[in-house]
Amino acid sequence: YNLDNGLIISTNYNYISEVGELTAYQPNRIQGTSVGTSRPKNRYKLSVNHPRAFNDNIGYAITARYTEKYWYDNYLWYGIGELGGNLNIDTQVSYILKDYNILLKAGINNLLGQYYNTSVLTPKIGSTFYITIDYDGLIK
């Protein structure tokens, strides 16, 4: 939703239904056993941002994502295990230099610093800090 004051609110919801019997190719797997989709059944996302919240050149963005716990089964390549159940919050502030058509941004991904995996037996993902400089002739 784009509000009259410039605030933008967006949400996203993903639902994955496990339909039928999904059987992974594994020589040692018991015949007839089923595995999950290796994806969370429910995922949620909420974003709030305002590119010109203060003084018409200072903005912010906050995004929260939640992934429900799920059973990850990729025994052939990565293994099996429980993933998800993590809340990630990303934040960003921005500053527009109107005279130079430049947008400066600084932010933190995974503000809470809770390490998480997107696959089993892989390195965990932590926080990322970033600074960007965008030049665009349309920034005024």
Predicted segment positions?
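Gram-negative outer-membrane beta-barrel transporters
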Residues: 1-72
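Flexible, surface-exposed loop regions and adjacent strand-edge segments
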Residues: 15-19, 25-32, 77-81, 120-128
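C-terminal beta-signal and adjacent terminal beta-strands/loops
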Residues: 6-9, 65-74, 82-84, 88, ...
